[in-house]
Design a protein with these regions (language model features):
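Long, compositionally biased stretches enriched for glycine and/or charged residues
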Residues: 10-282
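Short, acidic/small-residue loops that bind anionic groups at enzyme active sites
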Residues: 1-8
Length: 282
C-alpha cells in the first residue's frame, strides 16, 4: 500500500468549502495514479454534492485545493467543465505546462531549482531536530511540501491494525478490479482499509475515458523509468525521458540523460558501465 498526501488535502478542502460538520459522512470517488488523481463524485451522507463542488471550483467561487510546493494557479473553467472531474494540483504540470515552466524558471533565477531549495530547508530542519527540547512544529516545515503525510500514514496504520473498514485513498495493485486498466498496474484510488489490507471501492470499476490518454502516457513513462533503473542502460533512460510529456524534444532528452547520469554518479552504482562509456565519449 502506498500513501499519498494529496487526497487527504483534497478531502479537508471539500469538508471546508461544503461547510460539513464532523458528524457528516463524506465519501469521495477518487481515481488515477500517484500524485495524478481526479475526483469524479463526492457523497455527503449518501447524497452526491459533486455538481455543487465542481460548479464552485470551475466558476472560481471556490479556491481549489493545493499544496505548498506547487504554485497556486486555477485550472480554466473550460477544462473543469469539459472533463466534469476535479483534478489534483499536480495536474497543473500537464494542463498548464507553459505557465508552470515560466514560474519555475523565475524561481530558479531568484533562489535555485526546487531541489536546491528543499536541500536548504532540510538542512535547517535537521539542525532543529537535533534539539531534544523541540516540542513545536518548525515553521521551516511549511516550506518543504508533503503536508499531512503523517496524518495519512497514521490513519492508514490505524485502519489496518484496528480493522476499521474505513475509506482511504491509497496506491495499490488493483488485480483487475478496474476494467479499462491493465491488471498488473498500481493505481491510486478510493479503498476500504481493514486487517486484510486495502480493497478497491466497489463504486469505482472503470476509470473515466476522458483522461485515459494522459493516464496511459504517465504510466508508460513510469514503467520505462523503472525498467531503466533496474537495467542501468543508457538507452532505457533515453526511452523513458522521450516518453515523458514534460520533455518536448528527443535532442533535449539525450542531453538531459547524459547530464543527469553523470551528475549523480555516486548514487547510481547500477549505471557504472554506462557512466564509464559516457566519460569515454567525453
Amino acid at each position: 500500500i502506498g500513501v499519498c498526501n494529496i487526497p487527504i488535502g483534497m478531502k479537508m478542502f471539500i469538508r471546508d468549502v461544503l461547510m460539513l460538520k464532523d458528524s457528516d459522512d463524506l465519501s469521495i470517488d477518487l481515481f488515477g495514479l500517484n500524485h495524478m488523481v481526479f475526483i469524479k463524485d463526492v457523497l455527503v451522507n449518501g447524497k452526491s454534492r459533486f455538481a455543487e463542488l465542481l460548479d464552485g471550483v470551475a466558476s472560481g467561487q471556490l479556491k481549489a485545493s493545493g499544496v505548498k510546493n506547487i504554485f497556486d494557479l486555477p485550472f480554466s473553467e473550460g477544462l473543469i467543465r469539459s472533463m466534469n472531474l476535479l483534478p489534483c494540483s499536480y495536474l497543473l504540470y500537464y494542463f498548464k505546462q507553459k505557465e508552470m515552466l515560466a514560474i519555475e524558471m523565475g524561481e530558479y533565477y531568484k533562489g535555485g531549482a526546487r531541489a536546491q531549495v528543499v536541500q536548504k530547508v532540510e538542512k535547517q530542519l535537521f539542525e532543529l531536530y537535533k534539539n531534544p527540547e523541540l516540542n513545536v512544529k518548525p515553521k521551516e516545515l511549511e516550506q518543504r511540501g508533503g503536508a499531512y503525510y503523517s496524518d495519512a500514514a497514521c490513519e492508514v496504520i490505524n485502519a489496518i491494525y484496528n480493522d476499521k473498514q474505513a475509506e482511504h485513498y491509497v496506491n495499490i495493485p488493483h488485480h483487475g478490479h478496474i476494467d479499462n486498466i491493465p491488471a498488473d498496474w498500481a493505481v491510486e484510488m478510493t479503498c476500504t482499509l481493514g486487517r486484510d489490507g486495502a480493497t478497491p471501492h466497489p463504486r469505482i470499476t472503470h476509470f473515466d475515458d476522458k483522461v485515459m490518454g494522459l493516464i496511459h502516457t504517465i504510466k508508460g513513462f513510469e514503467i520505462a523509468a523503472s525498467n531503466a533503473a533496474l537495467s542501468g542502460e543508457f538507452n532505457d533512460v533515453l526511452l523513458a525521458l522521450n516518453l515523458s510529456p514534460l520533455v518536448h524534444s528527443d535532442r533535449d532528452a539525450e542531453l538531459l540523460a547524459r547530464e543527469m547520469i553523470l551528475a549523480h554518479e555516486k548514487w547510481l552504482p547500477n549505471f557504472a558501465d554506462c557512466i564509464a562509456e559516457l566519460k569515454k565519449a567525453h
